[in-house]
Curated annotation (Swiss-Prot):
Function: Probable transcription factor that may play role in specifying stamen and petal organ identity.
Subcellular location: Nucleus
InterPro entries per the UniProt record, alphabetical: MADS-box/MEF2_TF, MEF2-like_N, TF_Kbox, TF_MADSbox, TF_MADSbox_sf
Domain annotation MADS-box: ranges: 1-61
Species: Vitis vinifera (Grape)
Keywords annotated in UniProt: DNA-binding, Flowering, Nucleus, Transcription, Transcription regulation
The protein, known as: Agamous-like MADS-box protein MADS9
Amino acid sequence: MGRGKIEIKRIENSSNRQVTYSKRRNGIMKKAKEITVLCDAHVSLVIFASSGKMHEYCSPSTTLIDILDRYHKQSGKRLWDAKHENLNNELDRIKKENDSMQIELRHLKGEDISSLHHKELMAIEDALEIGLASVRNKQMEFYKMVKKNQRILEEENKHLNYIVHHQGMPMEAGNVREVESGYHQRAVRDYNPQMPFAFRVQPIQPNLQERI
């Protein structure tokens, strides 16, 4: 006599259900491996037990992502919602932008330019000239800042030397002010000959009142 037909329905006993799941799962995994080898098929299998534990198999010649992409293209079904699609598109855009920037960087370094047209080479030259001008401007700003700091340090050094030169004098509060005042007067005197003639103080003419 043949074996009777088994009714397919949920197994109520949890222990029996777990044993049956384990046997059937191993059988499905075995069949998936066999059809992969015998028929050169691409198979991806994912099984979740009632406990939440996952078991999976994928043909060695492919990946789950590749199979899902092929399914999406051939079936026309949407596997992702609009939010995920927007994120995927944004990732693609960023990747393309990054690739383009990498190419531009190689061109600016003089790499891979043999196949470029004249206009493309001119654009690279313009970009390099703009960058060089920016670097030179920064260098000039730095140079001016260094010269300014140098002048300040030289002035402070002169001030300190003047005070040290007069250190034999009693350094009371009044004398310190006199020393500093003498330094400033000397600085004005040293600077005065360098002033243009038109800005120098002219002596008062003694006979001016008599002429009036």
